[in-house]
From Swiss-Prot:
One of its GO terms (biological process) is translation. Keywords: Ribonucleoprotein, Ribosomal protein. One of its GO terms (cellular component) is cytosolic large ribosomal subunit. Gene3D superfamilies: 1.10.287.310. PROSITE patterns: RIBOSOMAL_L29. Belongs to the universal ribosomal protein uL29 family. The keyword Ribosomal protein applies. This is Large ribosomal subunit protein uL29. One of its GO terms (molecular function) is structural constituent of ribosome. InterPro entries: Ribosomal_protein_uL29 (IPR050063), Ribosomal_uL29 (IPR001854), Ribosomal_uL29_CS (IPR018254), Ribosomal_uL29_sf (IPR036049). Coiled coil: none annotated.
Length: 66
């Protein structure tokens, strides 16, 4: 999901997406430990998406508009 698409979502939708991404990250890390993960760069992408969502939520909390 692109940052512009994320900014269009409501806080509730962003929190739901954040929870989904955290669950996905947990599953990817588990697969990595078991040696089942083929593409380890997917962990990096999920972590960046989590950071983007947290940034958007914090901007909204502080009243910063981009």
């Amino acid at each position: 999901m692109r940052i512009t698409e994320m900014r269009e979502l409501t806080d509730e939708e962003l929190n739901q997406e954040l929870n989904n991404l955290k669950e996905k990250l947990f599953q990817l890390r588990f697969q990595l430990e078991l040696g089942q993960l083929k593409n380890s760069s997917s962990i990096k992408q999920v972590k960046k998406d989590i950071a983007r969502i947290k940034t958007i939520l914090k901007e909204r909390e502080l009243g910063i508009r981009r």
